[in-house]
Amino acid sequence: MKKTILSLLALLSLAVGVNAQTTWNLDKVHSNVKFAVSHMVVSEVEGSFKIFDGNLVASKADLSDAKINFSVDVASVNTDNERRDGHLKSDDFFNAEKFPKMTFVGKSMKPLGNNKYKLTGDLTIRDVTKTVDFDVTYGGQINTGRGIKAGFKAKATIDRLQYGLKYAPALEAGGLAVGKDVEITVLVEMDQAK
């Protein structure tokens, strides 16, 4: 009887362990949030955000049930040009004073095979929320001896005009001075919570 109870307890603890949630916190030093947008139709301008945070919580090994939360401080925008950064913080674009954060809340993370995922979630900029799909590449996990790390690369393209980033002077030759489509690239390294 005692062996049966111990076996049952061992099985139960194994089952609980399999379904236990694992939390991953952002390693901000080894992560970045970048964007690129066309400029004057003929070139691109790149930039990044310096202040951001996020986490991922999942109980399945394939991360298909992952819950992802990410936020960016829009006033931390950096294009290596102070004047342009000031313009991006203005009401023509982010209006950082009134809308200091942009957020992403993941709704589903669908495994596609070969460490590829389709991450779908709600992106909110200037209090406008739209569903966005990110193409995600999972870099895997490694035990560093001080903890477990995981890496991800996520890419999406959004129409900035749909979010109220309204600066859109037309060029005489056609097109916009600043393109409407913005490529977002998020490179993250995450630490498994202990």
For every predicted segment, state its role:
Residues 1-23:
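Bacterial Sec-dependent N-terminal signal peptides
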